C-alpha cells in the first residue's frame, strides 16, 4: 500500500476518526491504477467503481486559495443559488433607497417644487410597481441568468438583447466611479482629505466584500438596507415632530404647510416635466432583483413575496419622506444650489435648521453607506450582466468563467477595474469627462424597464398562442398585460419629457452640447440595434416560434392546495408579514 491509502491490489483504506490501524476498513475500487492521487486531497468512495476527490480542510488560506480554482471535475461551474427571500426583499429596497432620494431630491425640489415632486414620484412609482410585477412573473417562470436582457433576446429580438445588455453594462461602468467620488465627498462633511485616497480605500473594501460571493453580497445588502429603512422611518418621524414645533432647539415653532404652499410649483409645466424625468432615474435599481433570480433558492416562493412587499414599501418611503422634507425645506432655498452635493441634501438641511445636534452627522453616515452599497450593487449586477452576456455569445467567452464558489471572477474584476476612473476627480475637466461618459448610458434604466414590459406582453401572447397552460406559471402578475401596457406607456412619456427638457433646459438657453449629454443614449441604442440586426440578419420571431421551454420552471399548484384552508391565524400572519 502506498502513502495515500490506495493499495496495489485494488482496495482503498479509509481510516476511522480515531486513527487506529485496527479500525481501517477496506473498500473495493474498480480501477485504482487510473486514479491520480495528489497529496493535498483525500479519497472517498461514493459508489461502486467511483471515487470522489474531496479537498482536505487545510488552513484558512489554503481553502481560500482553492476556492478560486476551476471545478475539480472539469465541468463549467454555475452560479450558486444561495439567496433567500429575505435577501431578495432587501436587495430591492437597497437598490432603490440611495442617492436618488437622499441627494437627488435637492434638484427636484429646486426645479419643480413640492407638489410636482409628490405627483411625479407617485406617478413614476406606480409605473415601477407594474414593471416589477411583470418582472416578478418572468423571473419565477424563467429563473435564468441575465434576467431582462435575456428576456429581451428571447421574446423581442436577439439584437435587442445584445444592445440592451451592453447599454445596461455601460451605465454601470460609468456610474461606478461616480458613486466612489460621491462617497469621498460625503467624508468631506467631516474631514477634508484628498479624494483619491478614499477612492483607493473604497475599491479595496468592495473587492473584499465581493470575495464572499453572492451570499456575502446578500448579507451586506440585508444589513445595510435594514439600516436605510430605519433611517428613513426615523427621519419621517423626526420631520413630523419638527413640522409640528415639537423640537425645543427649533425656534420657528409650528411650521405646518406654510413652506409647502409657497413652493408647490416652481417653473410651472417646465419644472413638472423636469421632475417627472428625474423621478424615473431616482427609482433606478429596483430591477436588481431580476438579476438575482438565477442565484435565488426557490424563486417561485421568494419573488412573489418580494414584489408584493418591497416596492409598495419603497414607494411609500419615497412619497412620505419627500412629503415630509418638502414641508421643511423650500425649493427656493439657496443652499440647494451653493452647497456641495451631500451637504445640500434637503434631509440634512432639515435637521440642521432644527438645530438637532448629532443627527445631521448620523444621516450623512447613512448617505455614505447608501452610496457605498450602491457601488457594491453595481459590482454585483454589472458582473452578472457581463457573465450572462458571455454565455449568450454577446461578450468575450472568458467572462463565462466561474470559480468553485460560484463567483464570476473575470467579470467581477472587469467591473471593479472601472473604479479607477474615480481618480479623474482630481482633474479640472472631470465633470466634462463624466458627463459624456454618462451620456451614452443615462437612459439605460428606462430602456430596461420598457424591455421588461414589452417582453412580458410578448411572453403572455406567446403563451396563449402556443396553447400552454397558464396555471403552470408559479406567480401571476395581478395586473397582467394591462399593467405592463400602463408601465410601457408611462416610460414612453418619460422619454418624451426628457427629450423636451434636454432641448429646453431650465434656467438656460438651448444648447447642442447639453442636449447630447442628456439624450445621446437614445440614438446610440437605436443605431447599435439596427446595425447588429443587419449584420447578424436575424428576424423577429413569430409568437408560435418563441422558445417557452428552455429554462421554464413548471409550477405544481397541487402542492399549494395541500397547505390547507386559510385560517384566522394564517391570515393574521400574512397581514403582519406584509406590514412589517
Curated annotation (Swiss-Prot):
Claim: Transport is one of the keywords in the record: yes
Primary site of residence: membrane
CC annotations in GO: membrane
The keyword Transcription regulation appears for this protein: no
InterPro entries, sorted: AA-permease/SLC12A_dom, Amino_acid_permease_CS, APC_YAT
Region (Disordered): 1-30
Biased composition (Polar residues): 1-19
Topology of this chain in the membrane: Multi-pass membrane protein
GO molecular function: amino acid transmembrane transporter activity
Chain segments annotated as transmembrane: 112-132, 189-209, 222-242, 310-330, 408-428, 432-452, 488-508, 515-535
GO biological process, one term: amino acid transmembrane transport
Family, per entry: Belongs to the amino acid-polyamine-organocation (APC) superfamily.
The protein's name: Sexual differentiation process putative amino-acid permease isp5
Organism encoding this protein: Schizosaccharomyces pombe (strain 972 / ATCC 24843) (Fission yeast)
Amino acid at each position: 500500500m502506498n502513502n495515500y491509502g490506495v493499495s496495489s491490489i485494488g482496495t482503498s483504506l479509509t481510516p476511522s476518526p480515531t486513527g487506529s490501524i485496527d479500525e481501517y476498513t477496506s473498500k473495493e475500487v474498480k480501477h485504482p491504477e487510473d486514479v491520480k492521487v495528489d497529496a493535498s486531497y483525500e479519497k472517498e468512495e461514493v459508489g461502486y467503481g467511483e471515487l470522489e476527490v474531496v479537498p482536505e480542510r487545510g488552513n484558512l488560506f489554503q481553502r481560500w486559495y482553492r476556492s478560486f480554482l476551476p471545478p475539480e471535475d472539469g465541468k463549467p461551474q454555475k452560479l450558486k443559488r444561495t439567496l433567500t427571500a429575505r435577501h431578495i426583499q432587501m436587495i430591492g429596497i437597497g437598490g432603490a433607497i440611495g442617492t436618488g432620494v437622499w441627494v437627488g431630491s435637492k434638484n427636484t425640489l429646486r426645479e419643480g417644487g413640492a407638489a410636482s415632486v409628490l405627483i411625479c414620484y407617485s406617478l413614476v412609482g406606480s409605473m415601477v410597481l407594474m414593471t416589477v410585477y411583470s418582472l416578478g412573473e418572468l423571473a419565477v417562470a424563467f429563473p435564468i441568468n441575465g434576467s431582462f436582457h435575456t428576456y429581451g433576446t428571447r421574446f423581442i429580438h436577439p439584437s435587442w438583447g445584445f444592445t440592451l445588455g451592453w447599454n445596461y453594462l455601460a451605465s454601470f461602468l460609468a456610474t461606478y466611479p461616480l458613486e466612489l467620488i460621491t462617497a469621498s465627498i460625503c467624508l468631506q462633511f467631516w474631514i477634508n482629505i484628498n479624494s483619491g485616497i478614499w477612492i483607493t480605500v473604497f475599491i479595496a473594501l468592495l473587492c473584499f466584500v465581493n470575495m464572499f460571493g453572492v451570499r456575502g453580497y446578500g448579507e451586506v445588502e440585508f444589513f445595510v438596507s435594514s439600516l436605510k429603512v430605519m433611517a428613513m422611518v426615523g427621519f419621517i418621524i423626526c420631520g413630523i415632530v419638527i413640522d409640528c414645533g415639537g423640537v425645543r432647539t427649533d425656534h420657528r415653532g409650528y411650521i405646518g404647510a406654510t413652506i409647502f404652499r409657497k413652493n408647490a410649483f416652481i417653473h410651472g409645466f417646465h419644472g413638472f416635466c423636469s421632475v417627472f424625468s428625474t423621478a424615473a432615474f431616482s427609482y433606478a435599481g429596483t430591477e436588481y432583483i431580476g438579476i438575482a433570480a438565477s442565484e435565488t433558492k426557490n424563486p417561485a416562493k421568494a419573488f412573489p413575496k418580494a414584489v408584493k412587499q418591497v416596492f409598495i414599501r419603497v414607494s411609500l418611503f419615497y412619497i412620505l419622506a419627500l412629503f415630509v422634507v418638502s414641508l421643511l425645506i423650500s425649493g427656493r432655498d439657496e443652499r440647494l444650489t451653493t452647497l456641495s452635493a451631500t451637504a445640500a441634501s434637503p434631509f440634512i438641511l432639515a435637521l440642521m435648521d432644527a438645530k438637532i445636534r448629532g443627527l445631521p452627522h448620523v444621516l450623512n453616515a447613512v448617505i455614505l453607506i447608501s452610496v457605498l452599497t450602491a457601488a457594491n450593487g453595481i459590482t454585483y449586477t454589472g458582473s452578472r450582466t457581463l457573465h450572462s452576456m458571455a454565455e449568450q455569445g454577446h461578450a468575450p467567452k472568458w467572462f463565462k468563467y466561474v470559480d468553485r464558489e460560484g463567483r464570476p471572477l473575470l467579470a467581477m474584476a472587469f467591473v471593479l477595474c472601472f473604479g479607477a476612473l474615480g481618480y479623474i476627480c482630481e482633474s479640472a475637466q472631470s465633470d466634462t469627462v463624466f458627463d459624456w461618459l454618462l451620456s451614452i448610458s443615462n437612459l439605460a434604466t428606462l430602456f430596461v424597464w420598457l424591455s421588461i414590459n414589452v417582453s412580458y406582453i410578448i411572453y403572455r401572447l406567446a403563451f396563449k398562442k402556443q396553447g400552454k397552460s397558464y396555471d403552470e406559471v408559479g406567480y401571476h402578475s395581478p395586473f397582467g398585460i394591462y399593467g405592463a401596457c400602463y408601465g410601457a406607456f408611462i416610460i414612453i412619456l418619460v422619454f418624451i419629457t426628457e427629450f423636451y427638457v434636454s432641448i429646453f433646459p431650465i434656467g438656460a438657453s438651448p444648447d447642442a452640447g447639453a442636449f447630447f449629454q442628456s439624450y445621446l443614449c437614445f440614438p446610440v441604442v437605436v443605431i447599435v440595434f439596427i446595425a447588429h440586426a443587419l449584420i447578424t440578419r436575424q428576424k423577429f420571431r413569430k409568437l408560435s416560434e418563441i422558445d417557452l421551454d428552455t429554462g421554464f420552471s413548471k409550477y405544481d399548484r397541487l402542492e399549494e392546495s395541500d397547505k390547507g384552508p386559510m385560517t384566522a391565524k394564517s391570515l393574521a400572519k400574512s397581514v403582519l408579514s406584509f406590514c412589517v
